[in-house]
């Protein structure tokens, strides 16, 4: 699966290249949202209560309904730019995981292979980002985003599985989702309502270090792997 640092670096790349003019708070909320599922242990139990495999809560099969729920919230909007950005970051995290080989049921159940693949994907993602090789795409507004993700996931699992296939679909899918649901701020300074919502989401409480890193595009993430 993708490491937390890879989620952070990809979401930061999207902010730097698609929404460089957004406020630091809005960008930080998005980037923190993109790593929050990895540091929230409860998310790994998604699906377990229904008798499915334990600690597979980030797997595509277990997270499909939750992604659809997040999508509906984002489509409805009206929640302020900080909360919108945070939830969008969470959706981007799960979308990226959906196109990661070990997060699909077709991956062989072998811990050694899982760890080896994680390292290989981490190196591949770093190499691609360092060489500025990131697909930033969009789709027509009339296309249903949930149906589109299901369609490209079907195509994804039918192709040769590996780091290249993962990365190509991950970067396409997360940029499409971000472009669809990004909410442009009407003013450059976040409102008090947005700040209050950020506090409600525990953004500055549970990840003040991560937030500082997320808000500084030039800082390498530390302590997150």
Language-model segments: which ranges?
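N-terminal leader/auxiliary helical segments
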Residues: 1-90, 95-225
């Amino acid at each position: 699966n993708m490491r937390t640092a890879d989620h952070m670096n990809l979401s930061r790349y999207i902010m730097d290249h698609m929404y460089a003019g957004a406020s630091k708070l809005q960008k930080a909320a998005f980037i923190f949202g993109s790593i929050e599922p990895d540091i929230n242990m409860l998310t790994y139990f998604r699906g377990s209560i229904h008798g499915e495999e334990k600690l597979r809560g980030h797997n595509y099969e277990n997270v499909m309904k939750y992604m659809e729920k997040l999508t509906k919230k984002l489509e409805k909007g009206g929640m302020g730019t900080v909360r919108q950005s945070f939830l969008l970051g969470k959706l981007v995290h799960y979308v990226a995981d959906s196109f990661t080989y070990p997060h699909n049921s077709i991956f062989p159940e072998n811990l050694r292979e899982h760890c080896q693949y994680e390292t290989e994907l981490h190196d591949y993602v770093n190499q691609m980002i360092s060489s500025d090789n990131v697909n930033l795409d969009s789709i027509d507004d009339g296309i249903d985003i949930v149906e589109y993700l299901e369609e490209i996931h079907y195509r994804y699992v039918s192709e040769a599985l590996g780091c290249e296939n993962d990365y190509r679909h991950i970067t396409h899918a997360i940029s499409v989702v971000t472009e669809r649901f990004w909410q442009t701020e009407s003013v450059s300074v976040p409102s008090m309502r947005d700040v209050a919502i950020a506090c409600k989401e525990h953004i500055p409480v549970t990840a003040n270090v991560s937030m500082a890193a997320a808000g500084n595009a030039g800082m390498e993430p530390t302590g997150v792997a």
